[in-house]
Design a protein with these regions (language model features):
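Pyridoxal 5′-phosphate
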Residues: 3-389
Length: 389
């Protein structure tokens, strides 16, 4: 349970939307404050304060790279996951532009991937979108069956942000090497980083997208892993040559400091935190399954994401009602609110079920009491209101 201020009054809040964003721990805010107010040097400056900040950025990069399982020189800071996704897709297409103009992705990707691919279609590229099965799963076999000699890129997310399904990135990587070793592989790991164990060294992806604010870092900072098979990647932003010449612009040093501190905090007793989130999720499934007309959606194995539907009760009404009681859940991806979910649409659920899908997502701070309160509020919503669908 968290406390926040609304018009200077303390309001108790049960936060169950960690897949949208996460609370920033005080230690992260303190690390950022120090950089903002005392250690504010430009890393490109040649005087001692600038050179010291350059060393600090290198050290922070190494911390995050260690958690990713890659070399520091393979990790490039970005402003967000959306930027990383777009950069990876464009860089892969640029490298393979002379050997093929075909992309394989899925119908349940984040809109950063879907819309970038749609833009490339308008530029003459062909895109194949793999549909999930009825449980929301994407098999490596289905992805690999779509790969052709002219496939430049395969882009498949690591963890679905609405369902929590984990997709077989390592299996796809191994299959690609046998089918077409020129095809590059990108995975959006925004919902997987420090929630699903992986190492860039063994995963096999050529690009891995990360976002800081999903693990307790501030908004406005992310990173992109670029592997050794990517030759001379095209710079995202030409300019002063920051980020090893690939993403120019003065580094957001405070955000980078916060990102590194958040990684340190999350990695401390990480297995215990993941086990706790998995236990909270299992408890939520048990409690919510007892509510009439409530369905568990998907087959998500990630420990922090759970989608359910109260069939007949519109999701936005449920979200608004619980929000008025201080319980924060979502009606889908918070990155694309106001439009119907492409993930839910791809499952071909009955209309009454699809219109009632809500997402709960958990963090290390989520308690069993939080789940009890949410379950009670959902049951009360069901009992007080007649179905509208």
């Amino acid at each position: 349970t968290l406390i926040f201020l609304v018009e200077q009054e303390e309001v108790f809040m049960i936060y169950l939307d960690h897949a949208a964003t996460t609370p920033v721990p005080k230690a992260v805010a303190d690390a950022m404050y120090t950089v903002l107010t005392e250690e504010f040097g430009n890393p490109s400056a040649q005087y001692p304060m600038g050179q010291e900040m350059h060393r600090r950025v290198d050290a922070w990069r190494a911390v995050i790279a260690g958690a990713v399982g890659c070399e520091a020189k393979q990790l490039y800071f970005t402003s967000c996951g959306t930027e990383g996704d777009n950069w990876a897709i464009r860089a892969a297409c640029w490298q393979n532009r002379h050997t093929g103009r075909h992309i394989v992705t899925t119908a349940v990707e984040h809109h950063a991937v879907l819309n970038c691919c749609q833009q490339l279609e308008q530029e003459g590229w062909e895109v194949t979108r793999i549909l999930p099965d009825r449980n929301g799963d994407i098999s490596a076999e289905a992805v690999l069956a779509a790969v052709r000699p002219d496939t430049a890129l395969v882009s498949v997310m690591m963890v679905n942000n609405e369902l929590g399904n984990i997709y077989p990135i390592a299996d796809i990587a191994r299959g690609l090497k046998a089918i077409n070793d020129k095809t590059l592989l990108h995975t959006d790991a925004v919902q997987g980083f420090l929630k699903v164990p992986f190492s860039a060294k063994t995963l096999g992806a050529d690009f891995i997208t990360l976002s800081g604010h999903k693990i307790g870092a501030p908004k406005g900072i992310g990173a992109l892993y670029i592997g050794p098979r990517v030759r001379n990647p095209r710079p995202l932003l030409p300019g002063g040559g920051q980020e090893m010449g690939l993403r120019s612009g003065t580094e957001a040093t405070a955000q980078i400091a916060g990102f590194a501190k958040a990684v340190e905090l999350r990695c401390d007793h990480l297995e215990d935190k993941l086990r706790h989130m998995a236990e909270v999720k299992a408890y939520a499934v048990e409690k919510l399954s007892a509510i009439p007309d409530l369905h568990i959606i998907g087959d998500g194995k990630a420990p922090h994401v759970l989608s359910v539907s109260m069939a007949g009760w519109p999701s936005q009404n449920v979200v608004t009602d619980l929000g008025s009681q201080g319980i924060c859940i979502s009606a889908g991806s918070a990155c694309h609110q106001g439009k119907s979910s492409q993930v839910v649409a791809a499952l071909h659920l009955p209309k009454r079920v699809a219109a009632g899908v809500i997402r709960l997502s958990f963090g290390p701070e989520t308690t069993f009491a939080d789940i009890d309160a949410c379950a009670e509020a959902l049951r009360n919503h069901h009992d007080r209101r007649m179905p509208m669908l």
